[in-house]
Swiss-Prot record:
Family: Belongs to the CsrA/RsmA family.
Protein name, UniProt field: Translational regulator CsrA
Compartmental location: Cytoplasm
Coiled-coil spans in chain: none
UniProt-listed NCBIfam families: csrA, PRK01712.1
One GO cellular component, as annotated: cytosol
Domain of life: Bacteria
Pfam family for this entry, one: CsrA
Main location: cytoplasm
Function of the protein: A translational regulator that binds mRNA to regulate translation initiation and/or mRNA stability. Usually binds in the 5'-UTR at or near the Shine-Dalgarno sequence preventing ribosome-binding, thus repressing translation. Its main target seems to be the major flagellin gene, while its function is anatagonized by FliW.
Keyword terms, alphabetized: Bacterial flagellum biogenesis, Cytoplasm, Repressor, RNA-binding, Translation regulation
One GO process term, biological-process aspect: negative regulation of translational initiation
C-alpha cells in the first residue's frame, strides 16, 4: 500500500484519468473528491462489506435454500 500525505486542495493522480483531491479536513473526517471516468466504479468499502454480508446471510438462510430446492424440483417435474 502506498501512503501519501496531502494537504487541503492537494491532489493525487492515478493513471491518466483519475484524480483524487483532498477537499476538506475537519476533526476526524477528511472529505475527498474523486474525478474519474464514468466507467470506473467507486464504492465505499463499508458499503461493499455490508452488501457482501447480506448476500452471505441470504444464501445461508435455510428457507432460501429450501425455496430453491422446491423450485428446482418443480422445474424437473415440468420437464418430464
Amino acid at each position: 500500500m502506498l501512503i501519501l500525505s496531502r494537504k487541503k486542495n492537494e491532489s493525487i493522480h492515478i493513471g491518466d484519468n483519475i484524480i483524487i483531491t483532498v477537499v476538506d479536513i475537519g476533526g476526524d473526517n477528511i472529505k475527498i473528491g474523486i474525478d474519474a471516468p464514468k466507467n470506473v466504479q467507486i464504492f465505499r468499502s463499508e458499503l461493499l462489506k455490508a452488501v457482501e454480508q447480506e448476500n452471505k446471510n441470504a444464501v445461508s438462510s435455510k428457507s432460501v435454500i429450501q425455496d430453491l430446492a422446491q423450485l428446482i424440483k418443480g422445474d424437473e417435474k415440468k420437464q418430464t
